[in-house]
Amino acid sequence: MKVLWFAVNPSLYDAHRNGEHNGGGWIASLEKIIRTSDNIRLGVAFEHPDPIFKKEIDGVCYYPIRVKPGLRRRIYASEKDKIIIADCLKVIEDFKPDIIHVFGSEWGFGLVEKYVDIPVVIHMQGSLPPYVNASYPPGYNFFTQWKTSHYNPIVLLKRRFVWSRNDNYKVAREIDILKHCRYVMGRTNWDYNITRLYAPDSQYYHCNEALRPVFFNPPKTWTFRQRKRIQLLSVGSCSMVKGMDLLLKTAKLLKDHTDFDFEWLIAGPTGSFSFFEKNERTPHDAVNIKFLGTLSAEDLAVQLAEADIYVHTAYIDNSPNSLCEAQIILSLIHISEPTRRRGI
């Protein structure tokens, strides 16, 4: 069977030259599993700057899709999609798959379903319609961002003529993709409910995500430690929905109003963390927060084993792999609203 993926990252394509990557590890982990199957011929298509049509590595046929430069293509998602879809159809014609697997309904790849008779399954990741409804955390809005730019008029123009247009287009695009899809895969109640809303006639399959192998057999094992200073660990980025403002507020409350002795480690890119520090008027080092930077899978597994509690701060997330990886290694605080179960 020939299976073609349209993926949001290069999976293992760059592994031979860059080493293991960190973001989107579920796709690379799944590819490693698929490679062990003798009866599946895998193709992987993705955006990439390499100026080649295809390249075969270790039995997998990779299709790096290079978006040609152009001002409108760089600015507007709708213009970029026109180029991407044309290239996707060329990939389909060359690979001739039996099944097409699209990672994420919120990306433009799912539009290919309109143009082919081959079965296309949409693999749910996030979902933009509910995300856009909660774009900013409490106390934040566009003017918070604008103030941080020192009221730069270019930022205001981008908001009016680019960002809003792209947001509206992407929401409409995802709804259109789901309404046309015949097959969908998900793993949460949220996935199921969203697809029943926008694609009630589609066939739904439950599909758990593949985690990075090192977390199943970590280099260090978590054990309970009786120590004075508790070590908290969070993994994430500094986008608005990831709860960095909440993390800062919580750390400040703990530092100023309790005797709780803690150190709060953050793994992941924190280049934009200063935005939240300015708005909360709280420097991270004043409230026992320490940045670890982006870690390899092995180093992150060790950090999880050394932490006492994992804290996931995101306002919106859909069974994120960072949380799933943490659950394998250590105890954590997590509120699961659909099941009404709370606790450590």
Cite the ranges covered by each PLM segment.
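Membrane-proximal helix-turn-helix segments that form the acceptor-binding/catalytic region
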Residues: S29, L128, Q145-V184, N193, ...
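Short alpha-helical donor nucleotide-sugar binding micro-motif in glycosyltransferases
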Residues: I92, T294-L295, V302-A307
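Nucleotide-activated donor-binding/catalytic signature segment of Leloir-type glycosyltransferases, i.e.
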Residues: G268, F276-E298
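Acidic anion/phosphate-binding donor-loop and adjacent secondary structure
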Residues: R196, A210-R229, V302
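N-terminal subdomain of nucleotide-sugar transferases
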Residues: M1-P51, K252
